């Protein structure tokens, strides 16, 4: 474990923020720097089949050290950080033996407070790694990367019994592109785990069904003084559309298994307005109903417009709930839960109110639930991770490998 923190601090020092709306994969040059570094480190560790694809996926094998028909399993993390907040010049703070109360983030007024984040009350005495209040930390998912790298080193050095272990590091997870170019056949694992979760004990195999909704509104602009019966205000139409969307089914009013509509962006003028929604729901039927609802709203608001004015709606599915694929292979979850219990961790099965590469991979033939990393408050300046949580994640990865070797 001695290099776990060192690895993590090195990885977060590299700016690997991904960028939406870019055709190339990886979407940013910074990701290539970390991917090349990981490839080099894996080669130096003496692992085999180390590859880096032209789409930025690193794959590697730790060969089995025991004989028998043992299934090959995989562990996967992503190297990019969220576009939502700066990941440049990350300056981590290490708070040893946290004693409670507010933690100052840098020299400004920003604090990490248990009033806003009550989970801190559960972390007394632990070592917290925080931001300086100016950037995100990048624990999502460089904690996962560091944990997998450390687990590989532990498995190799301590000669713990295991079958073939396949590992992959992917780009552009935060913008939904990482798994699209993942070669499941080349990866060659029977199942895998993404290491991309939150607090210790989290084990996730349910995620949202997700879709994006883009609405283009074309109006007609004339001088306001002579506008009667002629002007069609695209902004007013946008406001009417949003007024029809259920206000009590938004991200800020929902939790657990509840789905939502989220107006993520809106811009425009009288002539033209654009709206971008995301739709999320765990239930497939409710998911389809939400998409129909958006189409009905657009049709209702657009009824009777002048032929030159119109509302155009495009819905695109992003990913689906991996539950239907993972539950077909219950042993995958059984092994992960047993590994946690063996490490004195109580498994916390909860739905992901989001998505992971594992969701897409599960529908590509690689069942892939999600393991915890020990991190919290992702995508912002209040992000932090505990060193103890990271160490627990390493222990669980190693134990999963060991338990799988007994499955022959």
From Swiss-Prot:
One MF annotation (Gene Ontology) recorded for this entry: tripeptide aminopeptidase activity
Compartments, record wording: Cytoplasm
One GO location term (cellular component): cytosol
Gene3D superfamilies listed in its UniProt record: 3.30.70.360, Zn peptidases
Cofactor note: Binds 2 Zn(2+) ions per subunit.
EC number: 3.4.11.4
Record field: catalytic activity: Release of the N-terminal residue from a tripeptide
Source species, domain of life: Bacteria
Coiled-coil region(s): none
InterPro entries tied to this protein: ArgE/DapE_CS, Bact_exopeptidase_dim_dom, Peptidase_M20, Peptidase_M20_dimer, Peptidase_M20B
UniProt cofactor(s): Zn(2+)
Any one GO BP annotation for this protein: peptide catabolic process
Family of this protein: Belongs to the peptidase M20B family.
UniProt-listed PANTHER family: PEPTIDASE T (PTHR42994:SF1)
Name this polypeptide is given: Peptidase T
Organism: Citrobacter koseri (strain ATCC BAA-895 / CDC 4225-83 / SGSC4696)
Gene behind the chain: pepT
């Amino acid at each position: 474990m001695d290099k776990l923190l060192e690895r993590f601090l090195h990885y977060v020092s590299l700016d690997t923020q991904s960028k939406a709306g870019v055709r190339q994969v990886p979407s940013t040059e910074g990701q290539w720097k970390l991917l090349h570094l990981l490839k080099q480190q894996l080669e130096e560790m003496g692992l085999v089949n180390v590859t880096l694809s032209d789409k930025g996926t690193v794959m590697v094998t730790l060969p089995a050290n025991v004989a028998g028909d043992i299934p090959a399993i995989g562990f996967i993390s992503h190297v990019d950080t969220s576009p939502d907040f700066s990941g440049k010049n990350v300056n981590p703070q290490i708070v040893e033996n946290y004693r409670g109360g507010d933690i100052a983030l840098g020299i400004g007024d920003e604090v990490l407070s248990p009033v806003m984040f009550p989970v801190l009350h559960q972390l007394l005495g632990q070592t917290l790694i925080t931001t300086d209040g100016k950037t995100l930390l990048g624990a999502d998912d460089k904690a996962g990367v560091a944990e997998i790298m450390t687990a590989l080193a532990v498995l190799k050095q301590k000669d713990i019994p295991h079958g073939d272990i396949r590992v992959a590091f992917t780009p552009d997870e935060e913008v939904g592109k990482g798994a699209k170019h993942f070669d499941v056949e080349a990866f060659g694992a029977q199942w895998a785990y993404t290491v991309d979760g939150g607090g210790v004990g989290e084990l996730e195999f349910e995620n949202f069904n997700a879709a994006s909704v883009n609405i283009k509104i074309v109006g007609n602009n004339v001088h306001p003084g002579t506008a009667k019966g002629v002007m069609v205000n695209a902004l007013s139409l946008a406001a009417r559309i949003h007024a029809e969307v259920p206000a009590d089914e938004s991200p800020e009013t929902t939790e657990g298994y509840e789905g939502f509509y989220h107006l993520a962006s809106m811009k425009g003028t009288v002539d033209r307005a654009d709206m971008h929604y995301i739709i999320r729901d765990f239930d497939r039927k409710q998911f389809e109903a939400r998409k129909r609802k958006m189409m009905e709203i657009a049709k209702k608001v657009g009824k009777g417009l002048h032929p030159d004015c119109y509302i155009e709606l495009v819905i695109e599915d992003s990913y689906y709930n991996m539950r239907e694929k993972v539950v077909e292979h219950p042993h995958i979850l059984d092994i992960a839960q047993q590994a946690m219990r063996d490490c004195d961790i109580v498994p916390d099965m909860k739905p992901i109110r989001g998505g992971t590469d594992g969701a897409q991979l599960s529908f590509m033939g690689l069942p892939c639930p999600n393991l915890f990393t020990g991190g919290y408050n992702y995508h912002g300046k209040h992000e932090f991770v505990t060193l103890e949580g990271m160490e627990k994640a390493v222990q669980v990865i190693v134990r999963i490998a060991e338990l799988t070797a007994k499955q022959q």
